[in-house]
């Protein structure tokens, strides 16, 4: 095998690859053995027709397609390795010369993994933010628990007040026409919850059972359905019932009923601890995002379009999987949100570009700093994945994953270790 490389443009090369005549003839023989059972020739059992007879009857060209595929499979990867080329997509192959007893000459034009000029990543002037938990936040969480555990009783007389649950029928109109999804029957709406459009719930305060009212509101600009964004709407509302929440006392008995704690003080302490953990996770995410933003901004990289397209494809598949788990199809989701596949892909583009660039840059930093994944980290991560995908026998699943996806698992850990290295060096 002989290969020549020509740079066509940024991140695109053309390889001219020559396969020796003997190797191409061997590929023709393999193609014959693969296909000889397809031909019926009088005087020969099926699959026993000699290659010379088939060549005479049909021409050697009948084996070219399979022989070319066999020869390319054997020579293309060898050429990539010899020339230290890392492709990111399938090649476009053109045959230059072909024939029995001759060299096979073909070109393979392929998009390559981009080169990166790493920017500043050591000693970045970025600090991890810190978020304190206030007593007000703790009280708010406890009150939410109190609200969720409230008894609901029917209000026989009187009018709707803030905090009540109004049982309503409603039908919405935009430009005088009813719109899809704007109708409900016996809907329990908690006044003050902010469930409906701004200023909807407030207009129900003071109404009694049996009252009807036209509620006028305006949809927000980013409502999610293009035909409703920023549109004024009128809802015909009928009050069918009113319910009142009876809140339990916030005391030690409440703590025992809603948690594993014996006292309200212990419950509040646990709530505070969980809020602190949540704040720490938020701070870590923001710190990490700031670091990634910095290294992307100071690094130079020409991102091949195909890598961006593949990442968006992956994000779309993830979205579809999450929707299926919730019992929705992608088409249903698009209909509900007023989106299209094209708009969703465009929406994902910025995040996809950021992720691909970050991975490429961090991989380059990892190479420069000789960052590795330890055996302990590999085994631990495989076991985590094993618990997720094979809960009945996590260890067995972990072993399967280590054999099938070790390179991918190792890459993820190296990226994480590299990011940790950069964060630890921040001032």
Curated annotation (Swiss-Prot):
SUPFAM superfamilies xrefs: FKBP-like, Triger factor/SurA peptide-binding domain-like, Trigger factor ribosome-binding domain
Gene3D superfamilies noted in UniProt: 3.10.50.40, Trigger factor ribosome-binding domain (3.30.70.1050), Trigger factor, C-terminal domain (1.10.3120.10)
EC number: 5.2.1.8
Chief site of localization: cytoplasm
Residue span(s) of domain PPIase FKBP-type: 163-248
Pfam families given in the database record: FKBP_C (PF00254), Trigger_C (PF05698), Trigger_N (PF05697)
Keyword Aminoacyl-tRNA synthetase tagged: no
Catalytic EC class: isomerase
Keywords: Cell cycle, Cell division, Chaperone, Cytoplasm, Isomerase, Rotamase
Highest taxon of the lineage: Bacteria
GO biological process, one term: protein transport
Localization: Cytoplasm
GO MF terms, alphabetically ordered: peptidyl-prolyl cis-trans isomerase activity; protein folding chaperone; ribosome binding
Catalytic activity: [protein]-peptidylproline (omega=180) = [protein]-peptidylproline (omega=0)
A single GO cellular-component term on record: cytoplasm
Function: Involved in protein export. Acts as a chaperone by maintaining the newly synthesized protein in an open conformation. Functions as a peptidyl-prolyl cis-trans isomerase.
Comment text on domains: Consists of 3 domains; the N-terminus binds the ribosome, the middle domain has PPIase activity, while the C-terminus has intrinsic chaperone activity on its own.
Similarity comment text for this entry: Belongs to the FKBP-type PPIase family. Tig subfamily.
Protein name per its UniProtKB record: Trigger factor
Native organism: Clostridium botulinum (strain Alaska E43 / Type E3)
């Amino acid at each position: 095998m002989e290969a020549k490389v020509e740079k066509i443009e940024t991140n695109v090369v053309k390889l001219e690859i020559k396969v020796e005549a003997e190797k191409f003839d061997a590929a023709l023989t393999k193609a014959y053995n693969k296909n000889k059972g397809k031909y019926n020739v009088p005087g020969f059992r099926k699959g026993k027709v000699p290659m010379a007879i088939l060549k005479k009857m049909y021409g050697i060209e009948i084996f070219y397609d399979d022989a070319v595929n066999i020869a390319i499979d054997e020579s293309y990867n060898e050429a990539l390795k010899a020339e230290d080329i890392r492709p990111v997509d399938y090649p476009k192959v053109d045959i230059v010369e072909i024939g029995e007893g001759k060299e096979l000459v073909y070109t393979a034009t392929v998009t390559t993994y981009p080169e990166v000029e790493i920017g500043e990543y050591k000693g970045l002037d970025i600090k991890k933010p810190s978020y304190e938990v206030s007593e007000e936040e703790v009280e708010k969480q406890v009150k939410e628990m109190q609200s969720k555990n409230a008894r609901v009783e029917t209000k026989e007389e009187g009018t709707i007040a803030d905090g009540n649950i109004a049982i309503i029928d409603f039908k919405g109109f935009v430009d005088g026409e009813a719109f899809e999804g704007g109708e409900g029957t016996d809907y329990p709406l908690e006044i003050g919850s902010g469930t409906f459009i701004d200023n909807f719930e407030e207009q129900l305060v003071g109404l009694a059972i049996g009252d009807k009212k036209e509620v006028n509101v305006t949809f927000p600009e980013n409502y999610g359905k293009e035909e409703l964004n920023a549109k004024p709407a009128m809802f015909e509302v009928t009050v069918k019932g009113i319910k009142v929440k009876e809140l339990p006392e916030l005391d030690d008995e409440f703590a025992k009923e809603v948690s594993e704690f014996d006292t309200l003080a212990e419950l509040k302490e646990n709530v505070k601890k969980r809020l602190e953990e949540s704040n720490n996770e938020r701070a870590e995410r923001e710190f990490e995002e700031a670091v990634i933003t910095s290294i992307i901004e100071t690094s130079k990289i020409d991102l091949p379009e195909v890598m961006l397209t593949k990442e968006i494809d992956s994000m779309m598949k993830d979205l579809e999987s999450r929707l299926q788990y919730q019992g929705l199809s992608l088409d249903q989701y698009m209909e509900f949100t007023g989106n299209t596949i094209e708009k969703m892909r465009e929406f994902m583009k910025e995040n996809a570009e950021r992720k691909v660039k970050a991975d490429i840059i961090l991989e380059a930093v990892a190479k420069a700093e000789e960052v590795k994944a330890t055996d302990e980290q590999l085994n631990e991560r495989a076991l985590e994945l094993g618990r997720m995908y094979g809960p009945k026998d996590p260890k067995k699943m972990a072993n399967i994953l280590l054999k099938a996806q070790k390179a991918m698992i190792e890459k993820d850990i190296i990226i994480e270790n590299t990011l940790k290295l950069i964060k630890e060096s921040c001032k």
